Structures are given as structure tokens and as C-alpha cells.
Amino acid sequence: MGLFLLLLLAGPAHAQKSAASAKAAAADSAARPAAKRQLQATRISEAIKIDGDLDEAGWREAPVATNFVETRPTPGRPEKHATEVRLLYDDAALYIGAVMHDVSPDSIFRELTQRDDLGNTDYIGVFLDTYHDKLNGYGFFLTPGGVQLDARYSPAGGEDFNWNAVWESRTQLRGNDWIAEIRIPYSAIRFSDAAEQVWGINFARQRQSTRQQFFWNEVKPQVDGLINQFGELRGLRDIKPPLRLSLTPYVSTYFNHFPYNEQGKRNSSTSFNGGADVKWGINESFTLDATLVPDFGQVQSDNQVLNLSPFEVQYNENRAFFTEGTELFNKGGLFYSRRVGGQPLGFDDLDGRLRKRTTDSDGQIRQGEYVVSNPGITRLLNATKISGRTKNGLGVGLFNALSNDVYATVQDSTTGQRREVLTQPFSNYSIFVLDQSLKNNSYVSLINTNVTRQGSTYDANVTGGLFRFADKSNRYALKGQANYSRRRGQVFGSTEQVDNRDGYKYSLELAKISGNWNWSVNHGIESDTYDPNDLGILFSNNSISQEASVSYNKYEPFWKVNNLRTNIGLYQTLLYKPTRRQDVGFYSSFNTTFTKNFFSLGGNLDGSLVQHDYFEPRRQPLGEYYVRVPANIGLNGYGSSDYRKKFAYDISLAGRWYAADGARTGRNGYDVGLSPRYRATNQLSFRYNFNFSQRHNEIGYAGSLSDQQVADRPFIQNGVADVILGRRRRTTTTNTVSASYTFTNRMSFTVRTRHYVSVAHYRDFSRLNPGGEEETVDYRRNRDNSFNAFNVDAVFSWWFAPGSQITVVWKNANASYLAGDETLPQYFTNFNNTLNTPHNNSVSVKVLYYLDYLTLRPKKRG
């Protein structure tokens, strides 16, 4: 009886253990990459006409890549509507022919968009890992409407659609199928000169009618990485990297109008520019890319904002030269390309440097000179990139750019005499990168950035090393980074020496990277003297940080949703020198997509204990003064409807609530975002973005004090100004309207209008004393301010030949900053003022023409 009971009890326990083991084994298998498929390339001798017909004999002889596997929304499921891809090659190019079967013509979504803009459409994608390092690759995408997209893939840059190549393609719709024919010339990619080669390869298909994505070689979402989940392309023999040499000259003309309406000043002006981009394949691995006398006047206008923080605003890079092929230079986060050709070094402090003061009889102080013009950008003379990767996986990058002197013009208010003041000396910017790819999706990298300026103005140098080591199963990874910064010379515009103390930064992270459950722990230090900001961007140094996080991701559909992603983490930050507490808090997030209507929903919850903000007071050295930020909690939610519908929208709501801080209560803030979009046809679409935010009883730095202001003088003792904080209400409203009409897959027109207004109203003030103590004071200066920015960007683009483009751009711009009694508190008052103040208008035409040596050279006769 006892033995029977023992077996009876042991049976279920053993079954549960076996079930748990089976479940764990299944999870372990799902977290491993799928077995690699192989595709044999077929060499051809006959010419292939890129017309979308696939009627040449070579297509019938080539092996077929088919039986695609779904990645989302249901990973691992075989495709229902077959995809058939064939690959041919000759001495000059790869040829890809693909047939995508579907249920009906109406199921093939084919919105027309601009190049590199994926709309509401199907697509076929071709991925190449030409060095088979499982880290770096190329992507070429084609939609049924013939729109091309291309991208580079790397650990530093992720998926980068800023990269552009010149390749050919055509598509056709036949009954329930659509066909794609693609030619990728060897000049568009880089590979070794080995006699026989094995490349990583994969094909992707997006079926937009069902929001399904498929890959030929299965890509598991729970496995970290994309390139490492490619199949293999074999049979490439005796292909040689061609001479890659191209020249893209440009000419441009600008007409500008601003209503100065002043005697001696013209309201309109014209200018003509010319230059060229040169690309030269130094060998099979490395390419030189240079821009000579570049013209970036047609790039999209920046989204200007009112900045009340102690840190600069980081703007997007819209200049093509600095976004294409820069993945190596972005290693380590030490390169902020807006520094090159950006705002002059002495732009902000010009008034202080030239201040020659005289005293009037009424005791008011006036300035002896005033600024007539102060250019906000630096003229770039040229820029050059050399980059590539050897067959052994060593990536090498070299960047260099030269900018010219920049001068402001000032005028004496008494004599009327003008003079020029240097705001930026002739400067050289350079970056050097080494990046060694290792097995198991790992790498080791070294990067150096340097800024050298003419004359005695200081030079800056930063050197960094970083690594990532993953285990053989690609489940765990250790990564780290160490940087060292150095400055030598004089502060610009003075004889004062730059503080010669060098600085450093390091970080270390251990993480589980594959599977449903993942986690990470990291630690980092930035010394008080670490400063990479001459060619990089760092908002604040002098910190010690620790963080730990756990995430759970469900990749398969369950209940009523397609997937689920969750994350929760804890963090702590300290001031590095002197060691002081800054912040302790938590964060969490989730997002999911519903199965039936493909509505995406997400949210975030975070909170922190009382923070000590050492940067808001703008007082050096750090550590003595700080602004207390009460314990707070923040919550936001966002949603997106199904983009397949003609009408779709995005919506977001966010709020933050603060605990009472002594007598100060009622501090909170909220944000609202709404973005409806309407696709009238496959060629015409509209989008509206509305964002509104308000901060109540926010405590912040009220501004610097000046002995020229009567209200400031009681708070300046012996030349040392107090730190004045203000309790303020800040309201920000942004409206953006855009429309796009695509004539063909090579011709489009877009227009974007943005109006931004932010108003800060101060209610009372306090003096900040050491140790975070605030003392109420009777400060009488009106510190209210408002900022308006209005921009219109209208662009007509026509790719009239491969790599060749005509663009016609109209820009309308206006920005105004009002302070004190001039501040406009109401939105519509600001809007009317923006419309009624002078605007700058610019119309420009730019023509690029792509010249490729391989197409221009005389062809050998048979």
C-alpha cells in the first residue's frame, strides 16, 4: 500500500517535472537561430533586361528560394501564399527575380511614396552580408509601385535608411501576383576578391493586407540580431570588385527675400553655387567619399524649440553626406555631425566680448557697439570619408572636414564705423576608427576624434575603446566602453588657458540578450572633467550611474493580442565629484498589438525619490548648489490605429505629479498628442500633428543677472550674482501639417508647415542658497518669455536618371523671441504676431547628375 501511494504521488510530480523540462527545452530551442538554408547562385552569360518580365532563360534554370517562414505576427508559421526568388550573377552584377503570389489584385497594397519612404504597401527585400561576418550587411527593398529603399546594417547604426546606392529595378502586376526584377551592380556593394565566396543572404516579404512579414531563412524575434540569422549564398566564383569611381557634380541657385525695408539694404538677393561629390573605390574593401564645396541649403528646417534647460538642444542631421555611410564613425557615440559646419564657437558670447560701455546722463548704460550680422553656421569647405572592411572583418574609417573662418560684423553706434569680429577660426575635424568583427556576433573597436583650430584657440581630442562579447549560443553578452578626453590651448576670444585637466568615462554592462526573459545590469562613470563636446555631444558629465532591468517579451499571438513587450528597471545616479546623491528611481513599460484590428497600445510608468539637480543652478563648481525636485511619478499611454485604413491616427496622453515640497504644492504637468492621417489615394496623403504640453508650478532657473538691469542689482554683491529660481507655468503648443503627392515612383511633391509656440510665465521667485535651501525674495524683474517658430518646407523632387535628381525647394521661415513686458501669453496672439512679422522666403533649384566610370568607359569589342 505504501509503495503504491509513493508511486501514485511520484507520478504526477514526475509528469510535471517532465512538462516543465519540455517547456524549458522548447524555450531554449526558440531562442536559438534557425538552421541556415543555402542558395546556389547561377552564373549567366546572356544579358538580362530589367523589365519585370523574367522571360530570359537564366531565370528558368536558377534554383528557387521559397517556403518563406513568418516572423510576425505569428513566428514560425509557413507562408500561405508562396514567394519564389531566384538569383543570377555575371561579371558585373547580381540579378534577383521574385514572384509574390497573392489571393487577388486587391490584396496587393501599393501606395506610391518617395524613395526610402515605406508607406502602406507590400515589399520584397534582399539582404546581403558580403563579408559573412554576421554583423554588417546591406538591404535592398522594392514595392509593387516600384519605389526603392536601401539600407545599411551594423551594430553601431542598426538599420540605416540614410544610405543610398544606385541600382536598377522594375515591377509588374500579373493577375493575383506581382513580380520584381532587380539588378544590383557590384559597384553598389563591397566584397573581397576571393576566387570563391560565401555570402550571408536573406529575403523578406511584407504582405501588408494581413500585416505579415516573412523571411526565407527564418528570423526569430526572440533571437538577438538580424544579420546572424541569414542563410548562405554559395557558388559565387571569379567575381572581381570593379573600379568604383563616380562623380556627382551639382549646380544650384537661390533667390532669397526678407523685407528689411531699410535704406542701403536690399530686400532680395540671389546666389549661385557649384560643387561635386566624388566616390572612389580605393580597392575592393575601401571607398573614398568626398564632398567639395557642399551646398546644404535645401535640407529640411530644424524643429526649433524654446530651451530653458541647462543643456543644449540636439537637432537631427538632415545633410545627406553626414547620414550616408557613417555607421563606423557613430561607434561609441563620440560623433555629433552637427558640430561640423555648425554654430560658430563664439556665436553666443559675441555681445559680451565686444561690450564697450558708456554712461548716459540718466544713469542708464548703453552699449558702444552693436551687432549688424552674426552668422549662425560655419561655411564648410570640404569633407572626406574613407571607410570599408577587409576580408578578415577589420573595419577602418577615416573622416576629415575643413571649415573656414567666420566673421560677425559690428558697428559703432556713435561713429557708424563697422568692423569684423572673428567668431570661428579655420578648423579641421577628423575621426579615425578601427572595428574588428569577431565570431559570435562580437566586436572590438577603437575610435579617435580630433578638432584642431588655427591660432591659439584650444584643440580637443577624444579617444575611446569599446567591445561586445557574446557567448556561442548568443544568449549572453558583455559590453563595455572607455573614453579619454583632452583639451589644450586658450579659451576662444581670450588669453585664458583652457583647464588642462583631462577627463575619462567608462561603462560596463552584462546582459541576457535572447529568449523571452532578458535582463541587464550596468555601471558607468563620467568624470567631472570629461568633455567630448567639440565633436560629440554630452549633456552632462560628472556622474556615477547604476542600472538594472528585466524584460519579458511574448512574441506569439495569445489571448486577443499578437505580441507583448514589457520592461521594468531600477536606477541610481550620483554626482562624481564631490560624491553626492542625485536620483533614485524606477521605470516600466509595455506595448502590444491587438490581433483583430491591429490597434497598437503601450504605456510607461516611472517614478523617483527626491532629486538633487546640480546642473539647473548653472553654478560652478558643482556640488554646493542644487535644486530640489520633489518625489514624483509619471504615467503615459499611447495608441496607434491600423495604418492599412485610409484614415488612421496616433494618440498619446502623459502626466506627471509631484509631492508637496514644503509650502510649494500643486506641481504637475501633462502632455497631449494627436496625429491623424488620411490617405486619399495611393498617391495623395495628408497628416496633421498636434502636441500640447503644460507645466504647472515648475521650479527653474530664472536667468542670468546683469548690473545693467535695475531689478537685478540688489542680487549682485561684489560682482557675484545670486542664483534666482522662479516658479513658472510653461505652455507649449506645436501644430504641424504635411501633405504629399507622388506623381511616379521617381517624382514627388511634399509640403510641411510647422508652427511652434512656447510661453513661460513666472509667478514668484526665490534665492537659491547652498545645500538646496530656497529663500523667498522680492525680485521685481519680469522674466516671462515666449518663443515662436514658423516654417514651411515645400519640395519637388524628380529622379530623372539613376542617381541624378532635380529638386525645387521653397522655404518660408520666421522665429521670434519676446521677453519681459513684450511677452505674448495667448496662443492666437502669438500666432497672429507670427503671421504679421517679416518672414524670410527662399526659392532654390538644385541639379545633381550622376556620372559612373563603368557606364562611361569605352566598351571592349568582342
Annotate each language-model stretch with its function:
Residues Q16-D435, S445-L446, T457, T837-N840:
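Structural preference for beta-rich elements and adjacent junctions enriched in aromatics
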Residues G11-A15:
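Sec/Tat signal peptide C-region and signal peptidase I cleavage site
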Residues M1-A10:
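Bacterial N-terminal signal peptides
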Residues E218-P241, V406-S473, K512, F598-K646, ...:
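Outer-membrane beta-barrel transmembrane domain signature of Gram-negative proteins
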Residues R379-L381, S387, A460, S473, ...:
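Exposed, low-structure sequence patches enriched in small/polar residues
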Residues T287, V293, S301-D302, F311-E312, ...:
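Extended, well-ordered alpha-helical scaffold/bundle regions in very large, multi-domain proteins
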Residues K265-R266, S309, N374, R418-P425, ...:
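Alpha-helix capping and helix-loop boundary segments enriched in small/acidic/polar residues
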Residues P249, F272-V278, F286, L292, ...:
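Extended, hydrophobic alpha-helical segments in both membrane/secreted and soluble proteins
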